[in-house]
Structures are given as C-alpha cells and as structure tokens.
C-alpha cells in the first residue's frame, strides 16, 4: 500500500498537468501541448521546483507550442529501478520527450536508455553521467541522443595532444570493450594518412578476464613513453596497476585515456597515476542546469519544426507496459528534426550516431594532488593547452625522475632565436627548426591565454642542438612569457633568469648577457659570443638643396664667370668688332655693307652664352680677326667650364645620407640631449643588461631615456626608421645583425659596430646545476673546432656588411631637380613682370621718358645724344636755359633763330605784291608769336589754342577742287610735334636769305631710329657728285666759311630725331580720310575731301598769312610731314580735265643775280656742321676728286670758270658712308642722291631709280631754253629725279591711277598685283609718259643733257624702261604742278622767273599751322606755277633736311627702307 501511495503521489502532478488542459481544449481550441519530462539523479544539488523554473516564458516566447515540464528526481539509478521509473512516468503522464541525467559513470545507463527509446519511440537526451558515456552500437530505430563526443572525436583530440607536444612515438592499448575496434581503426587510419611523422609502435588488445600474468606479458612489449588506452574505467584500474608494476607509469611516461576511462571526475581510483591525461566532456564550463535548458530547447525546437512542416506532433506514449512484440514504427518522428538544431544562438546539432557535432571537450590531467585539473580545451576543432612544456609528475614515491630530459627557456631575438609558425601542411616544424611553445594571451585584462606550438631556429638554437647531441639530453623548449632577459623587480626576478631561478626551467639559452647581478643567482657557461653595448642610428636621406645645381662651383666662380662673360669678354668682343677694319660696324661706316646687320653688345653676350652651354641657338659670328680670336679662346674656356661642371654635378644632385655621429655613451648627445634642437632622443629595451649598465653608470642619462624605451628590438627599429627615435642603445651583436640584414641598409651602428662595455652571451643554468661543466666543455670544443665561427658566418653576417663598399645608385626624382625647376619658374615670373612692364612703359611711361610730361628733352633722347657724342667725339655745348623755354642749348639756338625771324623789320627783299599788303609786317610778327605759343604748349601746335578739330575748307582755288588728297598709310603720335633742332625742315625767306622759317606739322609723329635712318639717308647724298666732276679742285673757302662749317653739330642731317622713313616707306598709299572732332575716328568709307578756301579754325593772323601766301607766287616751304590714321583702302587719283599751263608765268633763272647783291660763289646757304670723318684726311687734290654735277644754272654773262669755282665751293656727302662730296648746295636741304665709289660696289636691298638730277655743265642758256629742254626729261623721270622719290616694288600696285576716261564718281577699289599687270597692258599707263611735242619743240638744248652713268645708278627692282614704270612722273602731274605746287614735292627745281632782279632762290620760313589743314581735308600750301628744281640753299642759313611726309598733305610718297630689319 505504501508503494502504491508513493507512485500515486509521484505521478499525480503529471496527471494533473496532463488532464488539466483537456476541458479547456474542448471548449476552446488552443496550441498543441508538449510534455517534456526531466529525470535527474538525487545526488545533484537541485530540486524539482528549480528544474521546472528552468523553462519560463522567456524561453517559450515565439513557440507555437504549450510546453509543460515534468521534473523527477531519482534516488537509485540501477537498471531495474531506472526502467521502472521511466515506465511509471510514461503511464502516469503522457510525455513527448525525456531529458535524463545521472551521477554514475556506468556506460550501462546509456545502453538501457537506448533500449527504452527504441521500443517506445520517445526521444531521450542523455546529458550527464552514464547517460552520456560512449556507446558503441546503438539501435537504429532509437531516438537516443547524448551530450558527449564519439569515439572518433575523442581519438582526434588525443592525437592532437601528442602532436602539440611532439610525442610522435606512441603505443596503443585497448580491451575488448565495445567500440575498441572503431578506436583502433580510426587511430591507424589517421596516422597512416597524416604528414606528421607518427610512429605507432605497438597495438595491444588485452582481455581482462584472463590472469594478470598474461596482461603483464602484453604490456612488456611497450617501449614508448606515450601510451593511448581505450577501455572502461574498471578495466583501466587493472591495466594501470599492472603497468605500475612494470615501471610504465614513471616520470617519463604519458598515459592518455578517453572520457570512458575518467568517467565521473569525482571518483578517482587510487591506481590512476599522477600525470594521467584524459579527454572528457566539459563539466567545468558547461553546468547541469545549462544542459537541462538546452535539452528542453532541443525538444521544443524539433517539435516546432515538425508542427510547421506536418501540422502535428507525435502522439505521446501512454505506457511502456504491453505486448512483448515490437510495435509499428510511426510514419514521422522527431529524430530527423533533432539532427540539425540551433537554439539560443548555439549549434546543438547531432550526428546520425546520436553524438553532438560540436561537443565541448576539455583536456584534464591528474595532478600531484590527485585531482583532475583542466589544462586544455578543444573547441571549434582547435586545441589550446595551458602548459608550454608538459609537466613531469612524480607518479609514485618509488619512481625516480629522469634527469636527461630538460626544460629549457629561451627568448625570441633574431638572429639568436627566430620564431616561425609551423608548417600548415604537416602541422610540424620543418628541418633545422625545433618545436617550441609560445604563450599567447587571449584576454589582456585577465592574462588568460594559451600556448601555441611554434618553431624556433637561430644561432642559439643551433648551439642547443649541438649541445643536445654532444652532452646527451632531451629537452622541451618554450619561450619566456614576458619576453624579457631577466631583471630583479621588487626582489623578484623576471624573464629567463626568473624561469631558471624558480626552477621552472633547467637552463636558459639565448642572447643572455653575462653580468655580475645575474651571476649571483644563476650559473653562466663560458661566453659563446662576444658582445657589449653599441648604438644604432638611421641613415636619413637628407634633402637636396634647391641650389644644388649651382654647388659644383663656388659663388666666386659663378660671379667671375658672369663677370668675364658680361663685362670683360662680351664687351671686348663688341669693341674689337666695332673698331675692326673688317668688322660689321666699320664696314657700315665706310659704306661697304649698307643696310646690313650690326654687331651689338647683346649679340656678343648671346654668342658667348650659347658657346658656354652648347645651346643650338642662332648667333651672329663676328667678322673681325681680333674678335674671332677672343671668341675662340672663350670657346676653349667654355669646354673646360662645362666639362668641370658636368663632372661635379652628379655628386651634388644625389641625396646625401645623414648619420648622427656618436662617439660613445659619454657623448654630449647622450649626456646633454637638451642642448640640441630638437632634443636628441635615444632609448633601449628595459629589464636588460644594457639598461642596468646605463642606470649604474649614467643616472641622468638613464632618467632621460626612460620615456623613449622600446618594448623590443623590432619596435625600436621601426621607431628609428620613422624618426621617432634618433639612437637605439642595445647589445652590439644584435644591432650588428639587424644592421646587416636591414632592408635598404638604412640602419647602421656607430663606428662600424664599435662596442662599449664589452662582455659576452652565455647559457644560464640553475645554481649548482650538474650540467654546467659538460656544457662549458662542449662550447669550448665548438670554438676550437671552428664550428662556432661557421655559425657566426651563417647567422651573424648580413648582406649590408658584404655590400657596404658597393655604390648604390638611384634615380633622380623631383627633389633632386627642384632647383632647376625653381629657376625656370622664376624666369617665367620675371618674363611676365618684364612683359607687363614693357606694356606699361610703352602705353604709359614712354611719354615721360621722351619729354612729354616735362618741358625738358626726354631721357632717352638725352642718352642717345650723349652716346653718339661719346662714340663720334662730338662735343655738345651746354648753354644756358632760356627763361621762356626750358630746353637744351641747341634748342635755345633754335629759339633765338625763331625770335629773329619774328622780329624781321627789313622788307626790302619782298616782292611788290607783298610789300603792298598792310598786314605783312604784322603777319611776320604774329607768326612768330604763334610759334612761341606752340613752344609754350610743349611743342604741340595742334592744341596751342585748345581748339577742337573742325572741318577745313580747301585753300586751293576753284580750279583745284577736283584734286584728290593722299596720305601715307601711317599714324604718327604727338611726340613728333616737338620743336627740336635737327627735326624740322627749314626754308629760306625769299626776301631775306638770312631769315629762316620752320614748318611744324599739325599731326603727331612716331619715333623711329633717327640716326640709322639719317645715316642711310645721308648716305645717298654722297653718291656721284665727285665722280662726275672731271676736274678735281680744292675748295677755296674763305675763313668765314670754314668758321661756319664747324659750328653747332646738332644740325647734322643725322639728327632727324623723329623721322621714320623706314616705316612710311612700306605703307600703301591711301585716301586720307577727313578727321572730325570725334577723337580722330577712322572711317571705312571713302569720302571725297571737301575743299574750302581757308581753315575755319585758323586765327586771324593765320588767315592774314594765308591770304598773303596765296598772292605770292614764289613762296616755298618745307614741311615736317605728319600723318593721321589712314583708311586702309586705295582709290586711284582723280584728275581734273583740261588743265592748262598758265601762259603768263615766267620762269626766272634760279641762280641769276644781275644786281650782284651777294657773292656769286655763295649760291647756297652755309651749313653749321662738322667735317666728315674722311674729309680732313684727304689731300688737297683728292679731297674733291669725287665732285659730280649739280643742279645749278650759270648766269648768262658769267664765264664757265666762275661757274666751276662756285660749284667747288659747295659740297655734298655720300648717302651711304657720309663722306664729303662737293659741288652740291643742298647738303642739308634734302637727302643726297649720290654715293661714293666705295658704296657703289655694295648692292642695296631695294634698287633705287636715281637717274641724275643734275646735268652736265653745258653752254649758258636762258631760263626759257632751260625750261623747254628740261621739260620732257622731268616729265619722264617722275618726281623722284627731283626729290629722290624712291618707290617699292611690292607697294606700287596701291597707287594705280584711274584712266582719264573713268567717271570721277565711280567708287574706289583695291587692285592686286595680278590685276595690276593686266591693267598695265593697253590702258592709260601705256601712254602715260608721252611728252607733249609742244614742250619738246624748243630749239635750245638742256643745260645738262647727260644723265647719270649706269655705274652710278642703283640697280632697281622696278622696270628699266620708263614706259613700263607706272610710278614715273606724268604729264598730268606737271599740269597739276602748274596750277598749284603739290605739297608732296618738298624738293623741286625752281622755275625760270620773269623777274630779273629776283635772281636767287629765296624761301620764306612760315608756320605750317597757319596754313596747313589739321584734318587733312585739303592741300595746305598755295603753290605757284613752276617747274621745280632743287633749291639752292644759302650758306648763311641753317636748316635740316625736311621730313619725308607731311600729315597736312595727302600725297604719294615712296621712300627707301634703310635696313633689312625694318622691312622683315
């Protein structure tokens, strides 16, 4: 009755739980219920209430099941009691699964549970004790799963332990316990298929049912120190007892057993020896409560998966009592859903055999205290062990320890000990390495870690292997945990010394320095390596200075080079070439190479610069012998200079390596590091002999370096390379090795490995160790046999030591060439600044330099005149400044001359028409005032009265309104409005030869090269005057004439400061467009100039003068030409029909002087000039042997001798070389048309039609005869025969005249070269130059019937025949000249005059502003009807050659280019 009551009370809660939900389910359908029973042994410290609370709402959240947990504790776990409890529970409570755990170590429990599951089909989980033991053969129909490892899994861990400790030789002992065959088969298969060098010597299978004698016989076959045992716990007690009797459980034997042998860790048989190693399920980190929870979770997860898939769960088993026959297998069970289960983030899957896929196994060892100790863990197929060297336990008191197996500690430090990973394929150490254990921390806070198998090699490892073979010992090698050599801290030794002192290691082998402090606690062997303290520093690349390309030469050499180049050599070459008889400039001076290039200082510098640096630049080589010698010597200097520079350049362009020089530990950098900026940084590895030495000898140095100490050598090397450390102090042997093996050889030791505090490395042994003497003898033997030297050569010599003398070259990068690029950038910046300054100067500042901003001559003008005076030896007198006009002395002379012209009082020489005018005297007076007004306005006549531009009417009569005005295609600026001497054309007053007038242009002019242009202009004056005179005579000038000839040199014709013949000559002739008051705006359309009587903006004085001028038939003026902006279009000139020559015009004899008022020899004005450079050097007869014919007429009554004498008194000059030539009065009146013999040999760039203007002196003739005979010749030879009209071939197509038949209103058009050639054939130009017969029917021959010789003419590019030349003077032009003199003809023959008393030519100086049109709408002068000849100037007057162009007149002007540079 008591038994029944007991079971009733036991099953009642389950029945209540099972019966409780039924009415609710019937009333309301809910989630299916899942009943899980938990049965545990009574020895566990847990109650049923606690078991039921292990599964709460938190764990059941999200599950589609209503989980009910039934907990049951058992007092007895024998097989009968166990079956009874399980069957009674199934009968009382319908359960779907069972979680079972017991406290026994009997594998029979597992067999019983497997039997129950196979018959009831209830899933059972064995989580602890015998229920989790290995079960070899399970029923295939059972659903029995165990929280444990299979036989194969445990065998794998056992082999892994042996592999880590390099126990490759072992024996296998088993019994006939179920599963032994699987165990043996698996071990053999693993050994045979592994790369590890396993050696399984014996496989012994014992049958414990026989006598112990047979067992001993089998165990005696074991000769290995490692034995694998597979059997039950009871069988293990018997086998180990027999093994102890055979001495197989001593100090050097290792028994490794599975969890089947260890069983319950709380029950340890006494026969188990200390040091027994077992692989067991983790009971330390995997508690029973966690296992129960995971078991319930596995069942609920599997049921949920089945419900989700099949919509139902297996039916609960009501009872296990029934028929003996086997029930039917249900269609679906939980077995397949329990194989792959993941719950609570853990993989709890099972294999088909019912074991966990990832079991939690541990390695336990029976320590000397007879307790199981966890020493390792197997997790995720990885084994981690606690001990680096497996501890040797003294199993029993009767066992003697083996002294030949040593535990050795070492320290990783290349090249003495080098640690590497094991071979991943073989999982062992390769040849020449030994296994070693290295402790690796897992958790730094708790210092938890594991020992990992590594492989060690190096200098000390090779010595250890030699010692092991020589002294005969075995060893286990491990690395010191703290990575230190050994230091006493708080009276506790650490590092390798600590391991030896505290007997955890027998000896310490490595880079361990012998010192006094360590020798007190350990014994050292003899030194095997000499070492000490050394200092390592890093080579810094250094920086290449941007001026590295200049460093091959010192600064003084560069300065001397440029001084020699710019100051000495270049100037010497220039001077030698300038004064050389065959040089450029001397040839130009003598007329040998006109219009050719010149050799300047700039060209000399450019030539020498190109020679120095071998630049292939176009240079101009000198012609003079002296300068060539100088250049040749300079070329030799350049070769030496450049070769020396190139040879030394490479040494300065590379980056110099910088190394800190340290003499020793007592160096100032170590003792006083703060004296350097930045402070010198150095350190060492603490807890070593180096630090101890520094601490004891240099306390301040040790105190400073503590903040720079490094953790290890590798960290120190990185700090050196990265610049965090300047010097590293350490053992010399290690530093020498690191320096020799450093990548890039950037690390060096001072003094090539200089050592301070010399000592050595030794092996540390325990105090009083019996191994010391044997090890000392072995080390000495290695040294004597040379084996130690071989090891040093192998390990301690690096590649950098072998190649330290080799030159290591590298490419030059941008740092090496930075200086050159900086120089280029600076040159570009300087060029840009120069470019901006050049534009700023040209557009803004050059006016001030030319004198516009002040009332003084421009700076450039003064410098140019000064240079000229220095070179040519011309003295420039400094005169006092005018109180009214602040100019130079020569300009003051001009001012006085103008004032004298203003105050003319003598009117006796004026003709009757002028004398009758009441305004004549006031005209002269006010004209002078107008000039003074212009001077007060700084030379700008146009703005003297601040008048705006207005339209002008033509000053011509009605018969001139059809003439078109032309202007050269050129724009001049206001700088040419200056009234500077040498610039303006001067004319003579006809009434008084001593009166001079200047014509000032109203338009501004552009500055050009006055000296060069005048040099070439005057060159043409000296052409043929001397060569055509058959008789050379000396000028018998009076003393007065000689005095005048040496006066002011500023009136030389070369001083036409503002002439620009070269630029005007290359412009096409265009219509002159009228200007208005809108800022000189240029218009594109052509408008015919509107002629008016007088300019509207002229003052009253100007109008009076113009009216007077119009009635004066003999007034002539030379004007300074100015230009306005041209309209760049061509319009053939329009001609007036039926222009006839006035019949009442008499042509006076220009040189007739019946009244003999003046000397007959003084037919020209004497010029104040310097004698030419070759004039003084000629002999009396040779000086004038180049006289030529001249424009002059002899008086009717005068003999030929008088005429010749008069001619001899006048001279001209060569147009090219300025040599003096007589018989020409217009020395400074116009550009000379003559050349000397020397200049005739040189070809001009443009051939000039320079047919002789003067004729051979013939019989005396009257003016009428001269006119009739000279008329046709003058018409045929164009105005250039009178005024040196020089035309360009490439511009003549711009002036094609329109035929007479064309309509005047027809619009203008441009004509190209091709069209010109077509128009010339059969048009107006074919008969353009025909001479009227009426003009050629005169009976009197010309005074000069013979023209220039062919040899004296320039070879022209224009047609040779006058009929082919469209630029020659036409008859129509002469008709126009009869009516009014064209202002474009500044140099003309004077016509014969009826006035007998007016025998000499007299020119009036008048202001151009008083009659010139400021907007160029009409002609500016009223000219008389005359056939012009060149004026014969009186010597008493001074005037300069007139300007080529007059801006107030529209005319055609063609002038010769003076130089090739201006044309190109």
UniProtKB/Swiss-Prot annotation:
Changing residue 552 to K: Changed glutamate-gated calcium ion channel activity characterized by increased glutamate and glycine potency with delay in rise time and slower deactivation time course. Changing residue 598 to F: Found in a cutaneous malignant melanoma sample; somatic mutation. Changing residue 504 to W: In FESD; decreased protein abundance; decreased localization to the cell membrane; no significant effect on calcium ion transmembrane import into cytosol. Changing residue 788 to I: Found in schizophrenia; uncertain significance; unchanged function in ion transmembrane transport; unchanged agonist potency and unchanged channel activation by glutamate. Changing residue 552 to I: Changed glutamate-gated calcium ion channel activity characterized by increased desensitization. The record marks 614 as: Functional determinant of NMDA receptors. Disulfide bonds join 87-320, 429-455, 436-456, 745-800. Changing residue 695 to Q: In FESD; likely pathogenic. Changing residue 685 to G: In FESD; decreased protein abundance; decreased localization to the cell membrane; changed glutamate-gated calcium ion channel activity characterized by decreased glutamate potency. Zn(2+) binds at residues 44, 128, 266, 282. Changing residue 733 to T: In FESD; uncertain significance. GO terms for cellular component: cell surface; cytoplasmic vesicle membrane; dendritic spine; endoplasmic reticulum membrane; glutamatergic synapse; NMDA selective glutamate receptor complex; plasma membrane; postsynaptic density. This is Glutamate receptor ionotropic, NMDA 2A. It comes from Homo sapiens.
């Amino acid at each position: 009755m008591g038994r029944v009551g007991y079971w009733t009370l036991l099953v009642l809660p389950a029945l209540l739980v099972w019966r409780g939900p039924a009415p609710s389910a019937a009333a309301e359908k809910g989630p299916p219920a899942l009943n899980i029973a938990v049965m545990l042994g009574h020895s566990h410290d847990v109650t049923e209430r606690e078991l039921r609370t292990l599964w709460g709402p938190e764990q059941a959240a999200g599950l589609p099941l209503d989980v009910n947990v039934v907990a049951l504790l058992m007092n007895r776990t024998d097989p009968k009691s166990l079956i009874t409890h399980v069957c009674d529970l199934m009968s009382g409570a319908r359960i779907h699964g069972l979680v079972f755990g017991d406290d026994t170590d009997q594998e029979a429990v597992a067999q019983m549970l497997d039997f129950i599951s196979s018959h009831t089909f209830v899933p059972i989980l064995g989580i602890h004790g015998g229920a989790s033991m290995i079960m070899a053969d399970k029923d295939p129909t059972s659903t029995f799963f165990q929280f444990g490892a299979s036989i194969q899994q445990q065998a794998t861990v056992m082999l892994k332990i042996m592999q880590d400790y390099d126990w490759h030789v072992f024996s296998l002992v088993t019994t006939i316990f179920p599963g032994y065959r699987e165990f043996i088969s698996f071990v053999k298969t693993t050994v045979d298929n592994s790369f590890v060098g396993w050696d399984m010597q014996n496989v012994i299978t014992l049958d414990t049912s026989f006598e112990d004698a047979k067992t001993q016989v089998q165990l005696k076959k074991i000769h290995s120190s490692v034995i694998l045992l597979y059997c039950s716990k009871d069988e293990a007690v018997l086998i180990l007892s027999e093994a102890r009797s055979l001495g197989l459980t001593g100090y050097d034997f290792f028994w490794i057993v599975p969890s089947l042998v260890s069983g319950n860790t709380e029950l340890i048989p006494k026969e188990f020896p200390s040091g027994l190693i077992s692989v067991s399920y983790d009971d330390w980190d995997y508690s029973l409560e966690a296992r129960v929870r995971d078991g319930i979770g596995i069942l609920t997860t599997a049921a949920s998966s089945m419900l989700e898939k099949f919509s139902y769960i297996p039916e609960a088993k009501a009872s296990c009592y029934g028929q003996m026959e086997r029930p039917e297998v249900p269609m679906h069970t939980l077995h397949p859903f329990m194989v792959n289960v993941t719950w609570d983030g853990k993989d709890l899957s099972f294999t088909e055999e019912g074991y966990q896929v990832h079991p939690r196994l541990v390695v336990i060892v029976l320590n000397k205290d007879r307790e199981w100790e966890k020493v390792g863990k197997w997790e995720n197929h990885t084994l981690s062990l606690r001990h680096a060297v497996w501890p040797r336990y003294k199993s029993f008191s009767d066992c003697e320890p083996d002294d030949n197996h040593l535990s050795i500690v070492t320290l990783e430090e290349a090249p003495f000990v080098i640690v590497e990973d094991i071979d991943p394929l073989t999982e062992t150490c390769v040849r020449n390495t030994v296994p070693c254990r290295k402790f690796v921390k897992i958790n730094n806070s708790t210092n938890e870690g594991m020992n990992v198998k590594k492989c060690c090699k190096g200098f000390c490892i090779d010595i250890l292997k030699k010692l092991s073979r020589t002294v005969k010992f075995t060893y286990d090698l491990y690395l010191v945990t703290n990575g230190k050599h050994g230091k006493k801290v708080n009276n506790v030794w650490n590092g390798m010394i600590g391991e030896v002192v505290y007997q955890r290691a027998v000896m310490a082998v490595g880079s361990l320095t012998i010192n006094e402090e360590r020798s007190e606690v350990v014994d050292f062997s003899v030194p095997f390596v000499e070492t000490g303290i050394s200092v390592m520093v890093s080579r810094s690349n250094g920086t290449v200075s941007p001026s590295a390309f200049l460093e091959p030469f010192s600064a003084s050499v560069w300065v001397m080079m440029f001084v020699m180049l710019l100051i000495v050599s270049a100037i010497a070459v220039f001077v030698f070439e300038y004064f050389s008889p065959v040089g450029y400039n001397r040839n130009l001076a003598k007329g040998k190479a006109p219009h050719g290039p010149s050799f300047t200082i700039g060209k000399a510098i450019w030539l020498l610069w190109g020679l120095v640096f071998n630049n292939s630049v176009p240079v101009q080589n000198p012609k003079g012998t002296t300068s060539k010698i100088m250049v040749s010597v300079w070329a030799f200097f350049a070769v030496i200079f450049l070769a020396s520079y190139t040879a030394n350049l490479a040494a300065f362009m590379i980056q110099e390596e910088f190394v800190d020089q340290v003499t020793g530990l007592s160096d100032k950098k170590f003792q006083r590091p703060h004296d350097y900026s930045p402070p010198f940084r150095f350190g060492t590895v603490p807890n070593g002999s180096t630090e101890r030495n520094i601490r004891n000898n240099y306390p301040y140095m040790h105190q400073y370096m503590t903040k720079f100490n490094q953790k290890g050598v590798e960290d120190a090397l990185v700090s050196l390379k990265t610049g965090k450390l300047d010097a590293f102090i350490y053992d010399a042997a290690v530093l020498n090795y690191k320096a020799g093996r450093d990548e890039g050889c950037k690390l060096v030791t001072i003094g090539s490995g200089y050592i301070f505090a010399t000592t050595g490395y030794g092996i540390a042994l325990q105090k009083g160790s019996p191994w010391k003497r044997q090890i000392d003898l072995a080390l000495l033997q290695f040294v004597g046999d040379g084996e130690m030297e071989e090891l040093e050569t192998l390990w301690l010599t690096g590649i950098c030591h072998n190649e330290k003398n080799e030159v290591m070259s590298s490419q030059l990068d941008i740092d090496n060439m930075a200086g050159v690029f900086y120089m280029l950038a600076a040159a570009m910046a300087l060029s840009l600044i120069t470019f901006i300054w050049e534009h700023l100067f040209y557009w803004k500042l050059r006016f001030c330099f030319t004198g516009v901003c002040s009332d003084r001559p421009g700076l450039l003008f003064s410098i140019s005149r000064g240079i000229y005076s220095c070179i040519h030896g011309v003295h420039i007198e400094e005169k006092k400044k005018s109180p009214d006009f602040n100019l130079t002395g020569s300009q003051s002379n001009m001012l006085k001359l103008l004032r004298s012209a203003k105050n003319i009082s003598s009117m006796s020489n004026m003709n009757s028409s002028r004398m009758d005018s009441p305004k004549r005297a006031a005209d002269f007076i006010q004209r002078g005032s107008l000039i003074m007004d212009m001077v007060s306005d700084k030379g700008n006549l146009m703005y003297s009265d601040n008048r705006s531009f207005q339209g002008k009417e033509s000053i011509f009569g009605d018969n001139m309104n059809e003439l078109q005005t032309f202007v050269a295609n050129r724009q001049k600026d206001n700088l040419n409005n200056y009234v500077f001497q040498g610039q303006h054309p001067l004319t003579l007053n006809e009434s008084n030869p001593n009166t001079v007038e200047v014509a000032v242009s109203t338009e501004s002019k552009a500055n050009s090269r006055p000296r060069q242009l005048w040099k070439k202009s005057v060159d043409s004056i000296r052409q043929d005057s001397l060569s055509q005179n058959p008789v050379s005579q000396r000028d018998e000038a009076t003393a007065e004439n000689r005095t005048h000839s040496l006066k002011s040199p500023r009136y030389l014709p070369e001083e036409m400061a503002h002439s620009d013949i070269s630029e005007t000559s290359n412009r096409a002739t265009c219509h002159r467009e009228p200007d208005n008051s809108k800022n000189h705006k240029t218009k594109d359309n052509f408008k015919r100039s509107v002629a008016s009587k007088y300019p509207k903006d002229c003052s009253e004085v100007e109008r009076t003068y113009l009216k007077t001028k119009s009635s004066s038939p003999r007034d002539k003026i030379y004007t300074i030409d100015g230009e306005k902006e041209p309209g760049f279009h061509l319009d053939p000139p329009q001609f007036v029909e039926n222009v006839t020559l006035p019949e009442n015009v008499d042509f006076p004899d220009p040189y007739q002087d019946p009244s003999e008022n003046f000397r007959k020899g003084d037919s020209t004005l004497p010029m104040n000039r310097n004698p030419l450079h070759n004039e003084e050097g000629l002999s009396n007869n040779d000086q004038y042997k180049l006289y030529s014919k001249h424009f002059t007429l002899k008086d009717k009554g005068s003999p030929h001798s008088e005429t010749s004498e008069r001619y001899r008194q006048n001279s001209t000059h060569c147009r090219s070389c300025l040599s003096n030539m007589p018989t020409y009065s217009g020395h400074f009146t116009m550009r000379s048309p003559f050349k000397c013999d020397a200049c005739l040999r040189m070809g001009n760039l443009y051939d000039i039609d320079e047919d002789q203007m003067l004729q051979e002196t013939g019989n005396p003739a009257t003016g009428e005869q001269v006119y009739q005979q000279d008329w046709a010749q003058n018409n045929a030879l164009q105005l250039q025969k009178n005024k040196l009209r020089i035309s360009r071939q490439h511009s003549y197509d711009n002036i094609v005249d329109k035929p007479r038949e064309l309509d005047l209103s027809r619009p203008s058009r441009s004509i190209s070269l091709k069209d010109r050639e077509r128009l010339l054939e059969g048009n107006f130009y074919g008969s353009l130059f025909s001479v009227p017969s009426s003009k050629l029917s005169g009976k009197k021959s010309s005074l000069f019937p013979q023209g220039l010789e062919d040899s004296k003419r320039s070879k022209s590019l224009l047609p040779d025949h006058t009929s082919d030349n469209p630029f020659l003077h036409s008859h129509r032009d002469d008709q126009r000249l009869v009516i009014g003199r064209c202002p474009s003809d500044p140099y003309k023959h004077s016509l014969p005059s009826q006035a007998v008393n007016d025998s000499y030519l007299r020119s009036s100086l008048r202001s151009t502003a008083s009659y010139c049109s400021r907007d160029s709408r009409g002609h500016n002068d009223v000219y008389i009807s005359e056939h012009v000849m060149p004026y014969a100037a009186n010597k008493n007057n001074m005037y300069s050659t007139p300007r080529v162009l007059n801006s107030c007149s529209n005319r055609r002007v063609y002038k010769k280019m003076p130089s090739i540079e201006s044309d190109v």
